Amino acid sequence: MHEIEKTKRKRNKDILKMSKKIAIIGAGMMGSALAYPAFENGNEVRLVGTPLDRDIIDGCIKNNQHLKFDIPFPQGVKYYQFEDWKTAVEGVDFVIGGVSSFGVDWFLTEVLAHIDPSVSVLSVTKGLINLEDGTLISYPD
């Protein structure tokens, strides 16, 4: 066996050892887009829709594809409606919050407040937040 081939095999074994269980909360464009590289890098991916994502998750379950994407998700991505989110986050290594800025408060109260504090959480929020006086500010201002 060539040295290059040995190196590739060792790297692949190392990647498998590093694989993580990831729950992505939010099946919109951002959360769903992250499912591809997360899975392709050897991780178990659980995509959880918010209450606004019911049709998206139904489509994923039926066709393995987001309603607005041209390509299907990798085989093996698991899909959950929001009412099953607690099942989806059981045993995960980390949670990705893939909700819009207008959903951050919802994510904090409905999800983050109930996740085991030992689980790492990453937020990929983009956009603006609307203050009570009508002022728009960007996260994390």
At which residue positions do the language-model features occur?
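Short, Lys/Arg-enriched N-terminal segments with co-localized hydrophobic residues
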Residues: 6-17
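NAD(P)+-binding Rossmann beta1-loop-alpha1 motif at the extreme N-terminus of oxidoreductases
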Residues: 18-71, 78-80, 110, 131
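Residue-level detector of flexible, active-site-proximal loop/helix-junction positions
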Residues: 52, 86, 128
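A structured beta-alpha segment of the ubiquitous adenosine-cofactor-binding alpha/beta core
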Residues: 74-90
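Rossmann-like NAD(P)(H) cofactor-binding subdomain of soluble oxidoreductases
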Residues: 90, 94-141
